[in-house]
């Protein structure tokens, strides 16, 4: 979904509005038209709703079955043939007529003439006649004339004959044709997420490809003169660009296709240059440059283009969250602090990516847990602590990962959940019930 704004970039597919403002002189300290007066501060729920209102599922595309895991079906799938396509044996054993072995017992076995063998993937060499049998393998087609299989451990071969030691009923150890699916049966409805198990069913139903909702192409931009790549030596005031790599991984984990725009310096023109390929993307995710500092150019540039929806959320960590558009492409600007970036991704970017893929389960299920640490919160904010949850008998207990500073990335790496403290709550005492968002399985 694209927005109408005054934004235009050289080389983009959109043309400049005749009323667009002239570009301002390039300056590292230029902050565009940011109004430093109080701006509306949205709740987390309001901000997420505003973002999702601007996001729509992508168009459908054909996807080879082997590449469809995790994708969302754009249309229902029906079986093109019966599954299984023929009645087959569920056991290694002997194909028999049940009536021929009705009197069999260990003390008085029934003797049947052995006509041959049926292997999986081959046609039976003969039909089963009265008082005869065929050796049969698991998955092999049931020979004509037979209606049951005696397990190999319940019989013995001697001198070209088979001794059957137990009776069996008609249908024993068989998989009937069409018992899994009949031709025309619904295999999966539109909107279903494709799992490995479903891929197997789709393959058995005759499908080699499926129509899936598209995967969103996400342009990722990190900003800041201080950023250096992992492994590079750090000079005074410089830090490693962790956000770039955590975002790339998080976007791919959520089903997005990354367009890596690299690192923009704190210069207006470099920021513009990095956004030239925005027309190739369906979402832009940036980090840094969204607050009120003199070098926070991202928000200033977007304000100048009248492309900002909101830029403050009553959230800790991550209050300066920007939602805007670049040449009509939605942009979510996350703060530069590493933990703020990841919390913002979880609360806002991940739901947007899932919606673009046709998912309806946009938020992770929440659980109630008992906190083992006191939690202190500014009551005007909704705070998300990083926690480690574990199952303790019939309840879930949770404790903090340690230092909760928004710069302490390890607090997020060690966490398997987020602990939610809502607005209006100042303190949560040890032993109190809290809401948590599991990020990984809780043992």
Could you say what each language-model-derived stretch is?
Residues 2-4, 24, 28, 32-45, ...:
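Helix-rich terminal scaffold detector
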Residues 28-108, 112, 359-384:
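Short, low-complexity N-terminal leaders and the immediately following helix N-cap/first helix
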Residues 33, 42-45, 94-260, 397-398, ...:
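Short, glycine/charged-enriched hinge/interface segments at domain edges or termini
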Residues 61-66, 70, 74-75, 121, ...:
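Flexible glycine/proline-rich
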Residues 73, 85-86, 114, 124, ...:
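Short, conserved secondary-structure segments in the cores of folded domains
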